[in-house]
Regions:
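Active-site neighborhoods and metal-handling regions in enzymes and metal-associated proteins
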Residues: 1-489
Length: 489
């Protein structure tokens, strides 16, 4: 790493987990942070210094990072309320040179480092990969939105939403990998970087961009950039009646796939995490899935304490009395991502398993039936129910996230951040997923994808909860009544 820094004439190098489109789940071949550290989680960046490599991860990934990160990597475990970039800045001398890959950082994030001596790199020195593009060039489409002023859009979810186009050729996504120029009824969809770069370099007028989603390389090509926060995210967040109907149909099939895997677990012995994961994908495809919306999490016992357990093992076998957590979802023809988490038990559960499961179920029922205005309020309420509820078990992530073309969309967001201050409106779709985790025992997370209708929360997911894991003595009368609205298997 010292040799690399010297060759680049740097003192520090920031390595992102994203790609040039700034997506959350790039292919691992595009994820320089993975190449550098061995960590496969969806978020968390790395900083190379003269004497260390630092990996920054939030509470979802504390255990996973310890298990996956290379021995030469120092894992910085962010606590609730800590900001990754604030912790990165603490390690940097502002008078020394910090390298940042221009194609893999948003303009807005780059500007938060403006008091530092930045060297913007055109090529990722960790992953100098060849880019691939959609084969066919789409010449015409009818957008759902006409920008009255010249606007350049690079966020893949926004481009897919505006064009109504979907691409299922890549794993875990339905987005089209293109950039979009709109000026009134004029529109140009770019699938080729050379064409796009030439257009931007030669465009003489003002061009509206969102610094939060355009990469620094593209921004530098524009002669007269005008920053304006995108209105499209808010448009996308409120789903139309047609989108809600498409989602209902998608979740009907997701429920069937998960129900099938429940029966598979009940009726077969000696299954590994890997066996269950393969069978789950088969079931999704059987019910019409075009792709998984993310790599399914199938985690037995202690592995289920990792909120985003990365790789289902052939060596971890589900035995009598074991818990298995399954977090999964899929894309169907509408190109909307489904997301659900359930916990099953093989055989007879013990009292601790029942207590933890029931405590998480109580939190779900109370959150689902509450009437708060913002995601922050929901998240605060959930933590008041689960923090310190059971000794040794922690709820170390936000309550939920928006869903749509991407499995993680915002707004809405049910967590402790600025976006979560957005009002949750009718038509917004989101998850409610409380959990409790103990790395020495197991974890339980129960996740339903929901939407708001007429001021009330409605669940897309209809698959029920595990009767043998519920301790009814821990439920009050109101919670028992609420539970009757869901299937108990």
């Amino acid at each position: 790493m010292n040799k690399l820094l010297n060759e680049l004439e740097l003192n520090y190098l920031l390595i992102n987990s994203t790609n040039k489109f700034l997506v959350e789940y790039p292919e691992l071949s595009e994820n320089a942070r993975y190449t550098l550290t061995g960590f496969t989680g969806s978020t968390g960046d790395a900083l190379i210094t003269n004497d260390n490599i630092y990996l920054f991860v939030d509470g979802r990934y504390h255990i996973q990072a310890d298990l996956e990160a290379n021995n030469n990597v120092t894992v910085v475990k962010l606590q609730i309320g800590q900001n990754q970039d604030d912790e990165i800045r603490k390690l940097i001398d502002p008078d020394k040179v910090l390298g940042i890959v221009g194609t893999k950082v948003s303009q807005a994030r780059l500007e938060t480092f403006k008091r530092y001596n930045i060297k913007l790199l055109e090529v990722d020195p960790i992953n100098n990969y060849s880019e691939t593009h959609t084969k066919e060039y789409i010449k015409s489409f009818e957008p759902v939105y006409y920008a009255p002023e010249a606007t350049f859009i690079t966020n893949l979810e926004e481009v897919s939403y505006l064009t109504g186009l979907r691409d299922f050729s890549k794993d875990n996504t339905a987005k089209i990998w293109s950039k979009l120029f709109i000026n009134g009824k004029e529109r140009i969809l770019f699938n080729n970087d050379d064409d796009c770069n030439e257009f931007l370099s030669n465009y003489d007028g003002e061009l509206i961009v969102d610094k939060n989603t355009i990469n620094a390389h593209d921004y530098a090509l524009i002669k007269k950039p005008v920053h304006r926060s995108s209105e499209i995210k808010m448009m996308m967040s409120v789903k139309s009646d047609e989108e809600l109907e498409a989602y209902k149909k998608a979740f009907e099939r997701t429920d069937m796939a998960v129900n099938s895997i429940r029966d598979y677990i009940e009726n077969n012995n000696g299954l590994s995490e890997y066996d269950i994961s393969l069978k789950l994908k088969e079931e999704f495809i059987k019910y019409g899935a075009k792709s998984l919306s993310f790599n399914s999490i199938v985690a037995v016992n202690q592995n289920s304490a990792q909120a985003h357990y990365a790789k289902s093992s052939k060596d971890v076998i589900l035995r009598d009395g074991d818990l298995v957590l399954i977090d999964c979802g899929a894309y169907y023809e509408s190109g909307l991502a489904t997301d659900i988490t359930r916990v099953f038990v093989k055989g007879t559960p013990n009292e601790l398993q029942k207590r933890v499961y029931t405590t998480v179920l109580k939190a779900f029922l109370n959150c689902f039936n509450s009437d708060f205005k913002t995601g922050i309020e929901y998240d605060t309420f959930a933590h008041s129910l689960l923090d310190n509820a059971i000794e040794g078990f922690k709820f170390n992530h936000g309550l939920g996230h928006g869903i749509g073309i991407n499995v993680h969309e915002a707004p809405p967001n049910l967590s402790q951040n600025e976006i979560a201050e957005t009002e949750i409106k009718n038509g917004m779709c989101f998850t409610i997923e409380p959990g409790l985790y103990n790395p020495n025992c197991f974890g339980v997370r129960l996740e339903n994808s929901c939407y708001k209708k007429d001021g009330k929360i409605v669940s897309f997911a209809k698959i029920g909860y595990e009767k043998k894991l519920i301790n009814y003595n821990l439920l009050n009368e109101q919670e028992k009544k609420w539970l009757t609205n869901f299937n108990v298997l």
